[in-house]
A protein has these predicted regions:
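Active-site helix/loop module of the DD-peptidase/beta-lactamase fold
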Residues: 34, 39-43, 55-94, 115-118, ...
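Active-site Gly/Thr loop motif
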Residues: 164-182, 188, 220-281
Length: 325
């Protein structure tokens, strides 16, 4: 990490590594501190999926509910796209530029999305993108009666203790049209608490933020039976299997997610490692493009795994398949 900061002239970076209840690294490099806020890009998706799962836990939403149940502007076949498909990039909803337009509201943008032709038949393809998460964010608004930002704050950020994490911060300053897939910013400490909560199967500091079943749903393969290899994001990450808002970097031979992650375009790379009983984050804001920044952070994560193995950190003996570049 230190070499990356120097060679790429980055402001800083950070590394968090926890395994078997031991914190092996919580180190900042360059000008970064544990409270430095950076954009986390698509690692936002993990947060949005978790926010939706709180509604599932309360019985207000089912993952198999059609989007039209909450947003009647979605008509025809696309109205049958389910909440599960919104969170797994299999809904068929076409990408829309309005998700980036600050002068719109999330409601206005999603109405525009609903009027578009589907990109493909619902459930027939994995197409990684951002727009379906805006639709999911709007569902959250309708069900809770709150803005997406407020719903995230009350349901995830506050109980987890993510005091510096926002979807409408300095890097994307709009509360009216946040991008649930990509506009969050966070700190190492904040997101570290989130992955700790996911690792603990929904619990943190005695608070059950998510049920264990919801965490399991997020880590379960949602694209089984689909050929994902042609997708650009799969080609970048080398990971062909996806859950709900999270990639499945390592799976067992019976398809249980062992290591899941939520990598972002600027190289921010958080993970939960059930094989070594831990979690971690490569904390970096690397603007060289996702095709460079993400694989480099992924390699650093793999180096962490190798270092833990060299230290003799116990690992599950279950046969696994590891994906990545």
């Amino acid at each position: 990490m230190k070499a990356r900061v120097s060679s790429e002239n980055l402001d800083g970076a950070g590394l968090l590594v926890v395994a078997n209840d031991t914190e092996y690294r919580n180190t900042m490099y360059g000008a970064y501190t544990n409270e430095t806020v950076i954009p986390i890009a698509s690692a936002s998706k993990w947060l949005t999926a978790a926010t939706m799962m709180t509604l599932v836990d309360e019985g207000k939403v089912s993952l198999d509910d059609p989007v039209s149940k909450f947003l009647p502007e979605f008509t025809g076949a696309i109205g049958n796209a389910t909440i599960r498909q919104l969170l797994s990039h299999t809904s068929g909803i076409a990408q829309a530029s309005c998700i980036w337009e600050e002068q719109q509201t999330l409601e206005q943008c999603v109405r525009t999305v609903a009027a578009q032709k589907p990109a493909y038949a619902t459930g027939t393809k994995f197409s990684y993108g951002n727009t379906s998460f805006s639709v999911a964010g709007r569902v959250i608004e309708v069900v809770t009666g709150q803005s997406f930002e407020k719903a995230f704050e009350s349901r995830i950020a506050n109980p987890v203790g993510m005091i510096h994490t926002r979807f409408d911060g300095n890097y994307y300053p709009t509360e009216s049209n946040p991008v649930p897939a990509a506009s969050a910013e966070s700190t190492l400490n904040d997101y570290g608490k989130f992955v700790q909560m996911i690792f603990n199967r929904g619990q943190l500091n005695g608070v059950q933020v998510l049920t264990e079943q919801s965490v399991l749903e997020m880590e379960t393969d949602s694209v089984k039976g689909l050929n994902t290899n042609a997708d650009a994001a799969v080609q970048t990450t080398g990971i062909p299997t996806y859950g709900l808002g999270t990639w499945r970097d390592v799976t067992t031979t019976d398809d249980v997610g062992v290591i899941t992650s939520g990598n972002g375009a600027y190289g921010f790379y958080p993970w939960v490692d059930r094989s070594r009983n831990g979690y971690g984050i490569v904390f970096v804001f690397d603007q060289r493009g996702s095709d460079v920044a993400v694989p480099e952070s992924q390699r650093e994560m793999h180096w962490v795994w190798a270092a833990l193995d060299n230290l003799g950190v116990p690992q599950t003996s279950t046969p696994t398949t590891t994906y990545g570049r």
